[in-house]
Amino acid sequence: MPTAEPSNIVLTIGHSTRTLDEFIRLLQAHDVSRVVDVRTVPRSRHNPQFNKTSLPGSLKKVGVGYVHLSGLGGLRHAKSDSLNTGWRNASFRGYADYMQTPDFEQSLEKLIQLANKDRIALMCAEAVPWRCHRSLIADALLVRGIHTEDIMIPTRRQVHTLTAFAKVRGTTITYPAENQRSAQKRLPPSRRQPVEKSDSRKRPLSCV
């Protein structure tokens, strides 16, 4: 018998370079009733079909709601005394630092309230979940008992698992350096963090 789907579930999706029709078909294939946009900058120069000025109207035509939750957006700056030095990528380290703030907690609570009402999909730009800050949001949901899955194709979703080097105390997550080295060895090569070059200003992710 197929495994029953958890009653409390959040889906995630990256719009990437998909056409609007492709994106909508993905949402419909997974019964999404509301998109929660977690981009800090809700527009795309190369894919304007996903701009905040037009996407809500397009989704409304097919019965899908839209909410922009900027309080969960990326582009956060790391602190000089960061507890999250396990992330060598400055963008992820900055977001992990932001996860320790009341603003993040309040926005996450809004997300959970939306998930209690609708079948939601967190949306950002990056197609690959583990290259996007929505994977950290999924960590925060997971430690609160909320099952999260990443939409990959119309017929497949990927269950989110906690970041290997995360340290959890209650609902607080940090990513300390001492946990990172051993965790890296357990990951497949394709998911290991690259060694940063001396100039770390270049942002390798399209996640905003």
Predicted feature residues:
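Residues lining hydrophobic/aromatic ligand-binding pockets adjacent to catalytic sites
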Residues: 1-208
